[in-house]
Curated annotation (Swiss-Prot):
It comes from Pseudomonas aeruginosa (strain ATCC 15692 / DSM 22644 / CIP 104116 / JCM 14847 / LMG 12228 / 1C / PRS 101 / PAO1). Residues 603-637 are annotated as: Disordered. Belongs to the heat shock protein 70 family. Keywords: ATP-binding, Chaperone, Nucleotide-binding, Phosphoprotein, Stress response. PANTHER family: HEAT SHOCK PROTEIN 70KDA (PTHR19375). The modification Phosphothreonine is found at residue 199. The gene is dnaK. This is Chaperone protein DnaK.
Amino acid sequence: MGKIIGIDLGTTNSCVAILENGNVKVIENAEGARTTPSIIAYTNDGETLVGQPAKRQAVTNPQNTLYAVKRLIGRRFEENVVQKDIQMVPYSIVKADNGDAWVEVKGQKMAPPQISAEVLKKMKKTAEDYLGEPVTEAVITVPAYFNDSQRQATKDAGRIAGLDVKRIINEPTAAALAYGLDKAKGDHTVIVYDLGGGTFDVSVIEIAEVDGEHQFEVLATNGDTFLGGEDFDIRLIDYLVDEFKKESGINLKGDPLAMQRLKEAAEKAKIELSSTQQTDVNLPYVTADASGPKHLNVKVSRAKLESLVEDLVQRTIEPCRTALKDAGLDVSDIHEVILVGGQTRMPLVQKTVAEFFGKEARKDVNPDEAVAVGAAIQGAVLAGDVKDVLLLDVTPLTLGIETLGGVMTGLIEKNTTIPTKKSQVFSTADDNQGAVTIHVLQGERKQAAQNKSLGKFDLADIPPAPRGVPQIEVTFDIDANGILHVSAKDKATGKQQSIVIKASSGLSEDEIQQMVRDAEANAEEDRKFEELAAARNQGDALVHATRKMITEAGDKATAEDKATIEKALGELEAAVKGDDKAEIEAKMNALSQASTPLAQKMYAEQAQQGEDAPQGEQAKAADDVVDAEFEEVKDNK
């Protein structure tokens, strides 16, 4: 059995880790970094870039550079948060045929799981390069407050990337695993406050020693899947746009290139202001009007940034309060506070959290890597490499069905430990009703329409009977990934209907299979592209070396030699400009053969010169050696 890797699939950055010889190793990518930007770009020459290379070219290619796609995963196009996102990003968010939010690049519609799969493929390749063997299994993390559709979509992304997703694990739970595995024995309760690039989670977790096992039990979880560092960036970008407009009268919002430069500058300034009190945002030639080029130069203080985002930080406190209440605990019951996610490096966030919980957060947990480390530990638990860990997670939202009058009737309450199974008997609403529709919902509202619809299915052929007589048993079964399976059974006939909840939206099995095939085809295309690039480089190098040899040969090269070589050189240069690898290799061989006689002639002459070196020169060389020895002053060494 191969290694099970742990992947933190983040909104802004992703990270991959593996348990090796009892220690977790965060694996560096091809660029030498331990985290990879979750950015994908499609270039004009048909190449797909992932990570840092994609981020580097974003300024010149904003419409085809996709970032923060995780915020769209498992979401419907008409959701308010999606409509808000459309205003914020330079790329195109469109409505798919099934009503989901997809993206459109170069006229092609793509599902968010398909885009996220590109990041997962990069993580998979990073691990394979390090391990030197294929990797097919992974544990992938999701925000604790992700609903069923979002979890299912993340699992789909893994499949498209060629990974068997052994477990979907909640990010705060993974961070607690990373923190708690090597801590002293004894029970303690921790808060994991996870403010990442696009999502916010808070979990109350009890870490206990039970019969020699580390038991991690999630008591409650809460959050906001559309609140994160991206929103902090947007506040700063809006401020910079307003300041520039006041000064120059120009609104940069209509200029995608300028906005992309501003986005990068705002992100950099935000990071700098975590360690300095003031920074300059300086963008020369950001735009131009009739009077000439315009430069943006704005001083931003830490206090100014804090005033811009204070309400966002405060928005994280209510979920903390709710999670504590759901767990039946007070602030005084919390032993440790763990901060996860890059945005928690902001001093205002740290201060606000410390004030609410009455204690400073721990500083020994790496906020960028803890989640991937925890995922790797969970992977090792599933592989049987780690024996003494038990993870008890919860479902973040209440699950139920729509009943008479458009009411949501809960079957499994939020914060129920998973896996779990619950059955309840319902009946018909009308006399002689022959079928019932089971409408599965997720959320906390009493009105069914206010909750997230996860799917519908019918139980038909119910024998005629007065309303209220038939007994229909509805069973909800949540697996360890937090993914729901629902069945309905007519107790009189034993007839049963069941589904794995595929969101009323979501990708069909056929779509996933097609995307898997596309990904495999792209991998083959990428391999061919790499081989072609390598052949071109070799061809260029051979052209350069051959021209250098002709120059050095001077008169030793006959006109006939030169003509033969020049002809072969011209053919190779033409081949290098084309797309045929076999042609390039053939022309390289031809050039090698054409230049071999001249190379042999030059080599023979050089060897002859070495043998014919005058005796006087050799004697002089010997004299030089003696002089050097004579001049050496050993006492002063």
